[in-house]
Amino acid sequence: MAEPVSPLKHFVLAKKAITAIFDQLLEFVTEGSHFVEATYKNPELDRIATEDDLVEMQGYKDKLSIIGEVLSRRHMKVAFFGRTSSGKSSVINAMLWDKVLPSGIGHITNCFLSVEGTDGDKAYLMTEGSDEKKSVKTVNQLAHALHMDKDLKAGCLVRVFWPKAKCALLRDDLVLVDSPGTDVTTELDSWIDKFCLDADVFVLVANSESTLMNTEKHFFHKVNERLSKPNIFILNNRWDASASEPEYMEDVRRQHMERCLHFLVEELKVVNALEAQNRIFFVSAKEVLSARKQKAQGMPESGVALAEGFHARLQEFQNFEQIFEECISQSAVKTKFEQHTIRAKQILATVKNIMDSVNLAAEDKRHYSVEEREDQIDRLDFIRNQMNLLTLDVKKKIKEVTEEVANKVSCAMTDEICRLSVLVDEFCSEFHPNPDVLKIYKSELNKHIEDGMGRNLADRCTDEVNALVLQTQQEIIENLKPLLPAGIQDKLHTLIPCKKFDLSYNLNYHKLCSDFQEDIVFRFSLGWSSLVHRFLGPRNAQRVLLGLSEPIFQLPRSLASTPTAPTTPATPDNASQEELMITLVTGLASVTSRTSMGIIIVGGVIWKTIGWKLLSVSLTMYGALYLYERLSWTTHAKERAFKQQFVNYATEKLRMIVSSTSANCSHQVKQQIATTFARLCQQVDITQKQLEEEIARLPKEIDQLEKIQNNSKLLRNKAVQLENELENFTKQFLPSSNEES
């Protein structure tokens, strides 16, 4: 980098450099703030970035925006103070090489005036509290404007904007502030607060025709109290007056020098004695302004009448300007930029810590997510394998339980069938042979038997079956419970309640015995049909009594004579003795049923054989027995016969449904247990689905975490680069602070 011509360029370059750095810093912090905000507000990335991190980053973004605006308005500021008519305005004009501010006889600065450059080609001024730009073409117009504004007080500020093209000094962000005399007001504290706290250099313009006054010293003592070691220059103006008394000039100069040194070194203690030598100057601003105006017009500097020693005074003024420019540029860079540089380093250090914490949190989360994904895959495989094994075990268990239930119900039902007669005898209701009454009687008897058998079966089986079902359900739950999440395990008693199982036997007894036909007609025990039933059984007797009139074999045509060629009845070779008996009786019945002659013939045969007395006795006894049985055939006897017939019929029917009833009960048990298992399987399926979704989600989360790690590392590297730029700025523009650090 080429060495700048003017020391003031040092500030300009520093301002440009620090502004560029802070623009990058603001862009960087904005990017980091968006990154932290996106990370913090991502619901899938819990505890990666905290709310405090986000608040801190957003706070830095706002602060850097403000600092950027402040830096853009930063400039070097020099404030001129002194007694009234000490030549403050003349010094400013001399430094500007033009009569910018009103000065000289009759012109007294009655308020604060700041002179700064403008890029335009027209001068203008702005008063405090107004944004109006008042055009000013000449110094006289400026003086007139200031004089005519009655609202301007000593504590007001009027900003004068002078074209930079007309004054080189104003091109380098330098603002010169003129002030009223320190001896015209007591509001020194308000002046300091309003105009001095941001000043880089103070110039005390003293009248060399007199010594430093207490009012001047008092003001700078107050400045020294508010600012740490302010940069103060003392200009002993109007030194050209000493040319009229050359014999006293050195003594007066030495006297002024001693008093100024004492003031700076001993009283204010802002510099040491050696440094103070370069802070005190003896000049004539009026002479310098006149000479420079001459030079600006192309005429020699000494073209006007000047006092003796002018060149020495001009050289000293130029020395003052050189040292002043070096001092103010260094001081302004330090005061305007050093704290911002330190603050920027602190912000970068904090941002690096935030990025490091985000990186570490993302790394821990990513490592945890990788392990969690592996665990979820292992658990999913474990659940699937266990479900296959448990399904087989449950099927086997269900088969065992249903077989046991079927056996229990079958045994209990067989026992109840054996006790059916007792249950029928317990039934009491009005009995009458009338068909309508019998219908009601049978209906009530069916209901009584169905309720009784159902109750007895429930008493014998329900509790045992229920206990068996509950035990089996509990075993299944305990086996599948480890496959479910802890939260679901705690809620299993509500999701799958193990209620008492009510077994339904569903005998449907009414339909079962709906085709029962009672037979309560009186039959003599020695009657023909009774004997047939007794000897042949009900089925064969039915065949005989239903009218098998045609005999299977032929009887002899003549019973009295003996045939010459008797024929033997043709019977099948494989006919049994029972079938032969049926054939004989049927044949006999056929004969007796054809004609009443059979009775006479049989009676005659018996009478011839045993005699009439024995026959009479037999008939008497037979008739007495018939009469007894006929009189004993009461309604109660009919009811007993009815119940016995019903028991026999129902027993046969119930034995036919024992297997189906037990199978139905076992099916109910199977359904109950299978339902419980299905609900558990549903919960396991939900768990598997959740695991599958989690396994599918975790890779995306891992990718997000890797991106966050990469972004945090990238942002941290940017922070390091900005730190390096700040360090280079410090080395280049703030060497003293760099050495101190």
From Swiss-Prot:
| Location of the protein in the cell | Mitochondrion outer membrane
Gene Ontology process terms (BP):
GTP metabolic process; mitochondrial fusion; mitochondrion localization; positive regulation of mitochondrial membrane potential
Membrane topology, Mitochondrial intermembrane segments? 606-608
Substrates-to-products reaction catalysed? GTP + H2O = GDP + phosphate + H(+)
G1 motif: where is this region? Answer: 82-89
Q: Which Gene3D superfamilies match?
A: 1.20.5.110, P-loop containing nucleotide triphosphate hydrolases
Q: Where is this region: G3 motif?
A: 178-181
The effect annotated for residue 189 to A is: Causes mitochondrial clumping
Which leading EC class covers this enzyme? hydrolase
Effect recorded for residue 88 to T: Induces a strong decrease in mitochondrial clustering
Q: Which GO terms describe its molecular function?
A: GTP binding; GTPase activity; identical protein binding
Name the InterPro entries on file.
Answer: Dynamin_N (IPR045063), Fzo/mitofusin_HR2 (IPR006884), G_DYNAMIN_dom (IPR030381), Mitofusin_fam (IPR027094), P-loop_NTPase (IPR027417)
Q: What is the effect of changing residue 238 to A?
A: Abolishes dimerization. Loss of function in mitochondrial fusion. Abolishes GTPase activity, but has no effect on GTP binding
Region annotation G4 motif: where it falls in the sequence: 237-240
Which intervals of the chain are annotated as region G5 motif?
266
Q: What does this protein do?
A: Mitochondrial outer membrane GTPase that mediates mitochondrial clustering and fusion. Membrane clustering requires GTPase activity. It may involve a major rearrangement of the coiled coil domains. Mitochondria are highly dynamic organelles, and their morphology is determined by the equilibrium between mitochondrial fusion and fission events. Overexpression induces the formation of mitochondrial networks (in vitro). Has low GTPase activity.
Domain note: A helix bundle is formed by helices from the N-terminal and the C-terminal part of the protein. The GTPase domain cannot be expressed by itself, without the helix bundle. Rearrangement of the helix bundle and/or of the coiled coil domains may bring membranes from adjacent mitochondria into close contact, and thereby play a role in mitochondrial fusion.
Name of the protein:
Mitofusin-1
- Its source organism is Homo sapiens (Human)
